[in-house]
Each structure stands twice: as structure tokens, then as C-alpha cells.
């Protein structure tokens, strides 16, 4: 939701609608999706390399720790599926195209904002660790957030301009003006607080001598995500504005509305010159109703484990009863709501090679199994059973991309042998072994492979195996080693006994200013992240037959891209690991697992990736420009070269030979072959060490 231009108008220098508030010791209803977008985009975090999730986790932790220091009690509410009426669908499609274009622009070095794929999952995991109360609604959360805030008489934290329209007694705290990074202390009381700005709709309307009940009419006329009335919106409202107004259309409309005592009188005046009065009145009435607050369901959901009966009535009855609590708790992805309710799914574009099919193509088989569990089999709850004429097949419309254009395609839901006889209504009651076999078959993993992999590493390693087998173009060895080095970093950085010196040397400040990226590396890792995301969704639906990994420790984009760059510059893998270190031990464990899953011959036959060592340079700004990561490593070597032991520079060569294992390949839609990028440019090889 959102009223275009309203937030800017209220924050303009000529207005005085935001009042300073030393915020502390209150309940706070937080717009969760708005918050994680803000924390990601306002913290200068990596986006071009696919995200630095460990750094994002630290930002989220700091935010809630600062709230706690000020005795603020947060309640986080996250959006669920699309509205069952589909009244916002056109807006969502428009945003989909914009997000694709933003991802493309970022991939070619322009400054854009693209949310890394696993951001929401990491956000939810951090909230769980911190025991922050959180609810994921079944549909859009804005109305539920406002209703709860009014019921509990506490403010809302959000940047969504729709909360300027809701008549909330306790008002709105815009995230933009919520200075949480610097906790202040009241010298008189010695109490900590967060300096913020506070908006009250009643006081805003008072400045125009306008009835606050007219604000929903105002929002409906200007148009939000739900209501579009171009003939009424474009009536030259600026003629009612004051001279020198920073936004004459908004101010003029507010001045015009102030002459009416209430919504009915204003609507009558609006409709007089309108030809299609019935349709316009219907649109206005629906728009006004969207802002009418009555007690919702969130209070009961936050305070009780019991699911309110009313939340799954009507179209939402397609959701099996057992899925409701996991969805509300944020444990199960709201992705299933759109599949069951609308028979569609929207796939996020990432920083990838836009000349190739979407990186999400690699995870297609995983999604098809997911759709099969939701849509196939005997389901008493099945509401919309649309199928192609003459067949019993079920399809989901996937919205993705073809190059930089939004596209849609019917994707068949499939049923594997392990899924025979399974019903969605009773899926959670199936034995663990049955649910486990479904995800193992999907990822192409045998029982022998399962036994040889520690529980805590199973999901991430099986996803990596699936990626290596199914990704096109096939990942190179440097992609694999870079990914594993990132996991080593994540493991060590999350350990309380981590080698601090090693960690400080590996930290790289991500650059958002035209930062270079090797597009083949970005595409490969976007494919891996897509496989991980949809494997996590499948694992949730199957009630966690595999241990859920800590996503923040699995991928640090700036580091893995940096590692690939070092390998392509001639640094041997052994030289990146210090002999006898924890890093070497963990890397060897991960490498041994992958070799056992893939077979030694498969690894040896993979392309090295060194033939692309200069590929990224010709796709970015200038050939002579040195990457910030390269400069970082040069500085690191100057600092450490004098104190290094000669023994640590010895390159160790592994002579282990493993048998080739048969690799089941999952069916994937046909893709275009990647074009050759650049000829190989040999460069001088030299050795450096990253892990100490």
C-alpha cells in the first residue's frame, strides 16, 4: 500500500507535522517487511555480490538490542500472501518489472537497490534467536498492523505512507526518522531512549481544519496500491493550494476536502461531474473501507498458541489447518499461500547474467516437487483445482523474466515415487523417513550419501550437490571452492572461539559505487541461492526432515567473489589456507563431503574456471580500474609478509583418488547455451594467504 508523494510532503521543510519524541518504555508494532528492507538498504550492505548475510544479521541484532536497552517491547508483523481479492495484482506486476530492471542495472554497475534473496529468511532466524515476538499474516499486513496498534494504543514503526492515513491514537514513527543506531541517555533520569519523529493523523488534519475521517477519501482520490481513479485524481487540485506549496496537488486536495463535514458529503461532490458514477462510487467506498479499523486477529495470535477460527474462512480455507500456526509463526514460507490460493508464484530476479535464462531455472525441479505436494493427491481442502482440459495435470503460473522483461510460464506440478499416496492435509503426520525420502529424492541424494554427512551440514551440502549437477552453465571448481571458503568463514565467525585475527583480515567493505562483479560468478551463486531458498521452503513444508541451517553463516557474497578472484589471479587453493589452522580443517571437512557426494572424477572433470579469470573486466567500466577487493589484498600482504613462516607458503597437492558416483540429473527446462566471454589471458602467479 502507499499514497504516492504523501510521505515527502509531510516531511517537507514547510510542514511541521513530525514532532520529536524521546521514545522509550513502550510497546511498538513493527512493519517487519518495511524494517528489513530499510535495515538492508540504509546500512550500506552488499547487494551486488548477492548479500553479506552475516553483516545483515549483526545490523538486525543491534537494532533489537538497542530497543531492549530502551525498554521498548517490539512486536513484529510480516506480510503473508497476496490479497485474496487480487485488487493489487496490477501494481504487483508493475513492481515485478521494476525489480527485474533494477537487478539488471545493478549487474552492469549502476546504483540500484536489490534485496538479496535470503534476506527475509535471515531476518526471521535472527528474530527467533532473539526471541522477538513475530507474526506472519496470511495476507498483506498493513491493516492488521494498524488494527493491533489501535487496539493496544501503541505506535507503529514503518515507512509505508498508508500509516499516515490510518487514524491511530498512538500515531506513527517513520523508520526514516527513528534514530536507533545512537541510543541516548536522559541526563536527569539516566534513562536510555531513541530519538524519533512522531506523526498523529488527527493533528495533521487539524492544521487543515479537516475532519480526520476524510483522510481515507483523500488517499482514495490520489490513488494507492488498491484504488485507481485517474479521472478524479487529475482534476487540477493544485488550484486549491496555497502559493509556494511544495506539493500543490496534495495540499490543494486537502484544502478542498476541508470544506466537507464527512466522507459522504465529499463523495457526493466528487461524483457530480463523473460519467460512470456507479463504478467510481464503488472504488471510493472500497478504498475508504480499507482504512476502517476494527479489532483484528493479531492480539490473540501474539498471546496464544491457538489459531483463531476466523482467519482461514472464505477463500483462505484452501490452507490446511495444520499449516496455519507454522505460517503465522513465520516458520513456513507464505509462498504456499499464493500457490494454493492463486495458483501462481513470483520468482525474484537477482544480480545475474541477463543474457542467460533466469538463475531460478536451476531450482525448477525443487519447485515442481513443492507444487506437487501442495496441489496433487486427494485433498479435501482443494478449492481452486484448475487443470488443463483433457488432463489431470496441475500447473502453477510462474512469473519470472526473459532477459530484462517480465515473463510468465505454466509450470507442471510433479509427483515423484516417494510422494505417492501423500496428501497435503496429513503430510505432517507422515513418518520422518517418508518425509525425508521426498527431499532426498528431490535433491538426488542416496541413503548412503545421507549417512556420510553430519546432520548440521546435510541441507547445505545436498543443495550444493544439486547445484553442481543441474546448473547450466555448469559451475567451475573456482565457484565451488569460493562457496566452501565462504562457509568456512561463516562457521568461524559464528564461533565464540573464532580466530579473531583471521576474521579481521578477511572483512571487506562492500562498495556500492559502480563496484565490479564477474557476471559468471554472480550468475552461478545466484543459482545456488535459488536452490537453497526453495529447498528450505520444501524442507519447511515437510516439517523439517533435515536440520535447518543458519543461513547467515552460509553465504557472504563479497568474500566468495573475492576468493574466486584470488583463485583466478593464480593463487592456489592450498595457499589460501594456513597449514594446521581451524580454517584448513573445516574446509577439508566440507571438501571431503562434496567429493564423497560427487565423486573425485566429477570434481576433476569440472572446468577450472581459470579461463575466465579476466572475464569480468571487459564487462565493467574501465580496464585499468583496480577492484577494491584487489586493493584490500595488496594491503593485507604488505602488512603480513614480513612475519610469515616459509613453511606456510608450501603448496600441498592432494593425491586422493575417489570413485565416480552416478549422478541422477533432475529434469530442467531447456536453456540457451552461454556464449563465450573472453579469451584466456595468462597472468603472473603469486601466493598469498587469506586465513590465519
Curated annotation (Swiss-Prot):
Keywords: Hydrolase
Keyword Hydrolase among record annotations: yes
Its EC number(s): 3.1.-.-
InterPro entries: Asteroid, PIN-like_dom_sf
MF terms (GO), sorted A to Z: 3' overhang single-stranded DNA endodeoxyribonuclease activity; single-stranded DNA endodeoxyribonuclease activity
Hydrolase listed as a keyword: yes
CDD domains: PIN_asteroid-like (cd18676)
Similarity remark: Belongs to the asteroid family.
Function: Structure-specific DNA endonuclease that specifically cleaves single-stranded DNA and 3' overhang DNA.
Descriptive protein name: Single-strand DNA endonuclease ASTE1
Organism field: Danio rerio (Zebrafish)
Gene (name only): aste1a
Amino acid at each position: 500500500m502507499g499514497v504516492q508523494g504523501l510521505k515527502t510532503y509531510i516531511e517537507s521543510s514547510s510542514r511541521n507535522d513530525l514532532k520529536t519524541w524521546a521514545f522509550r518504555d513502550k510497546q511498538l508494532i513493527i512493519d517487519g517487511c518495511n524494517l528489513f528492507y530499510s535495515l538492508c538498504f540504509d546500512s550500506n550492505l552488499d547487494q551486488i555480490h548477492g548479500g553479506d548475510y552475516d553483516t545483515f544479521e549483526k545490523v538486525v541484532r543491534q537494532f533489537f538490542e538497542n530497543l531492549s536497552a530502551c525498554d521498548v517491547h517490539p512486536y513484529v508483523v510480516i506480510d503473508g500472501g497476496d490479497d485474496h481479492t487480487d485488487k493489487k495484482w496490477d501494481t504487483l506486476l508493475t513492481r515485478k518489472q521494476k525489480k527485474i530492471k533494477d537487478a539488471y542495472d545493478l549487474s552492469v554497475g549502476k546504483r540500484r537497490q536489490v534485496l538479496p534473496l535470503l534476506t527475509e529468511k535471515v531476518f526471521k532466524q535472527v528474530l527467533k534467536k532473539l526471541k522477538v515476538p513475530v507474526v506472519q499474516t496470511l495476507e498483506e499486513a498493513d491493516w492488521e498492523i494498524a488494527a493491533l496498534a489501535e487496539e493496544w494504543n501503541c505506535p507503529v514503526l514503518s515507512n509505508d505512507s498508508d500509516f499516515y492515513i490510518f487514524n491511530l491514537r498512538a500515531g506513527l514513527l517513520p523508520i526514516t526518522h527513528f534514530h536507533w543506531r545512537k541510543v541516548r541517555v536522559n541526563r536527569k533520569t539516566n534513562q536510555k531512549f531513541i530519538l524519533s519523529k512522531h506523526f498523529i493523523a488527527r493533528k495533521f488534519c487539524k492544521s487543515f481544519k479537516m475532519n480526520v475521517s476524510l483522510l481515507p477519501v483523500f488517499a482514495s482520490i490520489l490513488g494507492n496500491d488498491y484504488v485507481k481513479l485517474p479521472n478524479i485524481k487529475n482534476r487540477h487540485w493544485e488550484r486549491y493550494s496555497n502559493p509556494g506549496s511544495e506539493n500543490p496537488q496534495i495540499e490543494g486536495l486537502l484544502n478542498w476536502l476541508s470544506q466537507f463535514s464527512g466522507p459522504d458529503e465529499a463523495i457526493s461532490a466528487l461524483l457530480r461531474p463523473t460519467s460512470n458514477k456507479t463504478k467510481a462510487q464503488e472504488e471510493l467506498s472500497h478504498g475508504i473501507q480499507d482504512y476502517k479499523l476494527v479489532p483484528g486477529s493479531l492480539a490473540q495470535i501474539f498471546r496464544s498458541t491457538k489459531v483463531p477460527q476466523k482467519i482461514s474462512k472464505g477463500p483462505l480455507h484452501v490452507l490446511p489447518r495444520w499449516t496455519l500456526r507454522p505460517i503465522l509463526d513465520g516458520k513456513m514460507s507464505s509462498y504456499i499461500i499464493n500457490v494454493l490460493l492463486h495458483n501462481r508464484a513470483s520468482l525474484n530476479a537477482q544480480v545475474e547474467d541477463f543474457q542467460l535464462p533466469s538463475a531460478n531455472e536451476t531450482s525448477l525441479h525443487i519447485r515442481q516437487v513443492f507444487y506437487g505436494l501442495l496441489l496433487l493427491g486427494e485433498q479435501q481442502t482443494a478449492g481452486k483445482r484448475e487443470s488443463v482440459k483433457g488432463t489431470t495435470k496441475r500447473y502453477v503460473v510462474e512469473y519470472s523474466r526473459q532477459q530484462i522483461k517480465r515473463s510468465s510460464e505454466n509450470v507442471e506440478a510433479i509427483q515423484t515415487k516417494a510422494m505417492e499416496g501423500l496428501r497435503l492435509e496429513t503430510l505432517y503426520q507422515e513418518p520422518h523417513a517418508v518425509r525425508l525420502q521426498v527431499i532426498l529424492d528431490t535433491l538426488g541424494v542416496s541413503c548412503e550419501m545421507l549417512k556420510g554427512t553430519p546432520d548440521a551440514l546435510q541441507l547445505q551440502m545436498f543443495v550444493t550437490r544439486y547445484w553442481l549437477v543441474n546448473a547450466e552453465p555448469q559451475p567451475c571448481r573456482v565457484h565451488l571452492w569460493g562457496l566452501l571458503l565462504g562457509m568456512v568463514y561463516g562457521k568461524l565467525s559464528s564461533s565464540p572461539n573464532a580466530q579473531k585475527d583471521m576474521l579481521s583480515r578477511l572483512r571487506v567493505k562492500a562498495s556500492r559505487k559502480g563496484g565490479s562483479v564477474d557476471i559468471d560468478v554472480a550468475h552461478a551463486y545466484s543459482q545456488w541461492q535459488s536452490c537453497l531458498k526453495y529447498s528450505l521452503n520444501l524442507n519447511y513444508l515437510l516439517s523439517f526432515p533435515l536440520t535447518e541451517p543458519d543461513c547467515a553463516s552460509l553465504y557472504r557474497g563479497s568474500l566468495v567473489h573475492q576468493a574466486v578472484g584470488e583463485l583466478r589471479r593464480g593463487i592456489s587453493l592450498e595457499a589460501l589456507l594456513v597449514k594446521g589452522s581451524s580454517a584448513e580443517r573445516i574446509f577439508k571437512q566440507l571438501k571431503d563431503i562434496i567429493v564423497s557426494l560427487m565423486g573425485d572424477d566429477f570434481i576433476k572433470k569440472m572446468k577450472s574456471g581459470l579461463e575466465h579469470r579476466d572475464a569480468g573486466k571487459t564487462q565493467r567500466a574501465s580496464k585499468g580500474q583496480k577492484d577494491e577487493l584487489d586493493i584490500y589484498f595488496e594491503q593485507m600482504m604488505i602488512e603480513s609478509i614480513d612475519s610469515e613462516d616459509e613453511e606456510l607458503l608450501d603448496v600441498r597437492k592432494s593425491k586422493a583418488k575417489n570413485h565416480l558416483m552416478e549422478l541422477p540429473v533432475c529434469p530442467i527446462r531447456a536453456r540457451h547455451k552461454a556464449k563465450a566471454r573472453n579469451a584466456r589471458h595468462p597472468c603472473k602467479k603469486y601466493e598469498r594467504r587469506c586465513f590465519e
